[in-house]
Amino acid sequence: MVQGTNHKALTDTDTLGGRISLARDASALSLDNAAKMVGVESDVWSAWENDRSEPGREYLETIAASLQVSGLWLSTGFGLGPRWPGDETLF
């Protein structure tokens, strides 16, 4: 295991819901605020994060833009993922 890496956090990103949750955490948005940005109810957003349902294609790019990640990363886990506060990595 890489020092400082949370294995649970890495395995949680293996699903669309896990990536949505991780990106929201990195964005420091509440579940309610994230849902409002995308135009859905909080229980819908929660279902997405917990893999009880998946957002339709019409929401994926809006979610990605709201959470400042790429649509590719959100869908597949590859590409530009979340940036945490204080992350000074240059792209």
Describe each PLM feature range:
Residues 1-26:
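A short, Lys/Arg-rich alpha-helix, primarily the initiator
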Residues 4, 39, 56-73:
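DNA major-groove recognition helix of helix-turn-helix/homeodomain DNA-binding modules
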Residues 5-6, 12, 80-91:
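Interfacial/linker helices and their anchor residues that mediate assembly or domain coupling
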Residues 26-50, 66:
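Short alpha-helical DNA-recognition segment
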